[in-house]
């Protein structure tokens, strides 16, 4: 029918149902496919990753108007919530490390899990970071470092909280065991 995941030719977003009264989802949070069949926020060690949240679309339960937002508030009562997810299994992402000290070029190629922190309620942006304490070569981890950010303000390995370029290792689209 077509390639799985979405690429630039389709705006790069897949639509996934979200259960009513679900947990809050912030812009660029890691989104996973739960065994319930609904998309939800991924935490450290979660498998079946779909991608990162670009926004949500739903019919507002109070106004009955179609609504797009870059986040989903917890306990949203809408019954038609769709998560709009950057879900290409070959998508590159940038993520800030939680390392308070210097990082090393030798971290490139290693895998890691994320450290989940709820996003900011002032701008609704994800608080997820790369958990530097999990950096190693374990194939069962969530993401793999493929390089340092190309942004000159975020690519100093001697500074705290460097930004890495990563790919998803535990993608639902590449997982052979199912949900």
Locate the predicted segments by residue.
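Surface-exposed, low-hydrophobicity beta-strand/loop segments enriched in small/polar/acidic residues
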Residues: 1-179
């Amino acid at each position: 029918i077509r390639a799985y995941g979405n690429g630039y030719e389709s705006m790069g977003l897949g639509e996934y149902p979200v259960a009513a009264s679900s947990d809050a989802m912030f812009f660029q949070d890691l989104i996973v496919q739960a065994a319930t069949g609904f998309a939800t926020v991924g935490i450290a060690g979660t498998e079946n990753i779909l991608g990162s949240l670009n926004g949500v679309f739903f019919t507002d339960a109070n106004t009955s108007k179609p609504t797009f937002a870059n986040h989903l508030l917890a306990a949203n009562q809408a019954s038609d919530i769709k998560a709009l997810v950057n879900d290409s299994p070959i998508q590159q992402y940038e993520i800030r490390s939680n390392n308070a000290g210097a990082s090393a070029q030798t971290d490139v190629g290693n895998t890691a899990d994320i450290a989940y922190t709820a996003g900011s309620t002032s701008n609704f942006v994800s608080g997820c970071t790369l958990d530097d304490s999990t950096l190693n070569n374990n194939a069962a981890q969530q993401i793999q470092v493929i390089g340092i950010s190309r942004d000159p303000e975020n690519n100093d390995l001697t500074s705290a909280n460097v930004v890495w370029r990563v790919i998803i290792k535990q993608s639902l689209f590449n997982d052979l065991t199912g949900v």
